[in-house]
Amino acid sequence: MPKLKTKSGAKKRFKVTGTGKVVSAHAGKRHGMIKRTKKQIRQLRGTRTLFKTDGDNIKQYFLPNA
């Protein structure tokens, strides 16, 4: 049976760390920031770690070779 292909959209959005956790960028920072406070915008910087169950699903279905 051939290897499963990685979903190309997922490999642009998620990264698997060395310990196996899945990280992604925060959502909600593309447009409409005029409504948000400076603190809210600042807290959307960087990456976030997904919950274990969500990360396991991402690795199983979208990033099978990671």
From Swiss-Prot:
A Gene Ontology BP annotation from the UniProt entry: translation
GO CC aspect terms: cytosolic large ribosomal subunit
HAMAP family according to UniProt: Ribosomal_bL35
Organism: Afipia carboxidovorans (strain ATCC 49405 / DSM 1227 / KCTC 32145 / OM5)
Pfam families: Ribosomal_L35p (PF01632)
Family designation: Belongs to the bacterial ribosomal protein bL35 family.
Keywords for the protein's UniProt record, in alphabetical order: Ribonucleoprotein, Ribosomal protein
Name used for this protein in its record: Large ribosomal subunit protein bL35
Keyword Lipid biosynthesis: no
Origin organism lineage: Bacteria, Pseudomonadati, Pseudomonadota, Alphaproteobacteria, Hyphomicrobiales
Iron in keyword set: no
GO MF, one annotated term: structural constituent of ribosome
